[in-house]
Every structure is written in C-alpha cells, then in structure tokens.
Swiss-Prot record:
Family (UniProt): Belongs to the SepF family.
Protein name as it appears in the record: Cell division protein SepF
SUBUNIT field: Homodimer. Interacts with FtsZ.
Any Pfam family hit: SepF
InterPro entries from the UniProt entry: Cell_div_SepF, Cell_div_SepF/SepF-rel, SepF-like_sf
Lineage: superkingdom: Bacteria
Record function comment: Cell division protein that is part of the divisome complex and is recruited early to the Z-ring. Probably stimulates Z-ring formation, perhaps through the cross-linking of FtsZ protofilaments. Its function overlaps with FtsA.
Positions in coiled-coil regions: none
Any single GO CC term annotated in Swiss-Prot or TrEMBL for this entry: cytoplasm
Subcellular location: Cytoplasm
Residue span of region Disordered: 35-54, 159-194
Main location: cytoplasm
UniProt keyword terms in alphabetical order: Cell cycle, Cell division, Cytoplasm, Septation
Species for this entry: Prochlorococcus marinus (strain MIT 9313)
C-alpha cells in the first residue's frame, strides 16, 4: 500500500486502512482447540494459578510495601562514643547518624583546627537529617538523629563561659593556644565569639 492510498483512506475515514492489520490477526481458534483437547485428554484437571501464569504471584512477596529503616524497629537505642584522631574518621559518625544512632564525639585527641573542622562537618550532617546537637563538655559533643530528643536542664550553666585563673608565668602562651577547645560554629555566634 502506497503512501497516497493510505492518506486517502485516512481522509475518507476508512478505519482499517485497506486491511493492513489483517496480517497481524492471530489464529487463536487453532490454539484454543489444541489447548482444550489437551486439557480433556489429561483428565480435566484444573490448573492452579501458578501453573498457568507466566508470572510468579507468590514468590516470597508478602504484599507489604513497607521498607524498613535501620534502627527504627530496635527497642534499644544505641550510642556511639568516638574518639577520632583525624578528620578521616568523621564519615563514620555521619553513617552512625544515618543509621539513627546517637554519636558522642570526644575531640580531645585532635588538633584544634582539625577538631573544629570535624565538629562543623558532623554538625552539617546532623542538620541535614534534622537531628540535634549539643556541646557536652570541653571538646565533647553530642549529635543525635531526629528520633532522639535531647534536653538540657542546665543550659544556662553549660553555655556560660567559666573563668579559670591561670598563672601566666608558669605556662607559656603558645601552649595555651594549642590546647584550646574547639567551639562549634553555631555556639560561636550565640556566645559572643568565644
């Protein structure tokens, strides 16, 4: 069939377009008769849905569309205490938070600039999962996922800077600088730039 005759058929409203689809007609009568004869020959037993269906209806599928989240079904909460020595260990803290575990970071073993970087990194990950963060002590921080509620009853006492008098003659000023505890970025702005 040529293109012009097809266009004429479309314009004229011919639904079958000169029997182009007749070639695709299935010969179902012969197949149905053969299947019907084989069923009667085998004693007329009924086929089960799994025998006649090409798809596995059961196959271990329980019919539930619920996808489990790690840590949600467990009854006990888990707290990870981490004492990292380098920034390279911080992705483990983020992974623990993603698994809905609380993380306590003790950063006393790290250099102050690396500790500040680590606190900011984990604080960003905690913010991304809508978690909570709290400074527990000097260079010790608590990071919790959103499923954990963190409350601090002595927030005023914990956030107020404590003044410790030191004898400046006995301790060189350079060692005071390196032993300084990191202050997270979210507390530096609220505490007046400690």
């Amino acid at each position: 069939m040529s293109l012009i005759s097809r266009l004429r058929a479309v314009v004229a409203g011919d639904d079958y377009l000169d029997s182009d689809y007749d070639d695709l007609d299935y010969d179902t009568d012969d197949h149905m008769d053969a299947d019907h004869r084989s069923d009667h020959a085998s004693g007329g037993a009924l086929a089960t849905p799994s025998d006649s269906s090409p798809f596995d209806l059961g196959g271990g599928f329980s019919g539930s569309n619920v996808i489990g989240m790690p840590g949600v079904g467990s009854t006990s909460a888990e707290v990870n205490l981490m004492e990292p020595r380098s920034f390279d260990e911080m992705p483990r803290a983020i992974q623990a938070l993603r698994e809905r575990k609380t993380v306590i970071l003790n950063l006393t073993m790290m250099e102050p600039d690396q500790a500040q970087r680590a606190v900011d990194f984990v604080a960003g990950g905690t913010f991304a999962i809508d978690g909570h963060q709290e400074r527990v002590g000097e260079s010790i921080f608590l990071f919790a996922p959103s499923c954990v509620t963190v409350s601090n009853t002595s927030y005023d006492e914990a956030s107020a800077p404590s003044m410790v008098s030191q004898d400046h003659d006995s301790v060189p000023s350079s060692s005071q600088q390196t032993g300084a505890a990191p202050v997270p970025a979210w507390e530096a702005t609220s505490a007046g730039g400690l």
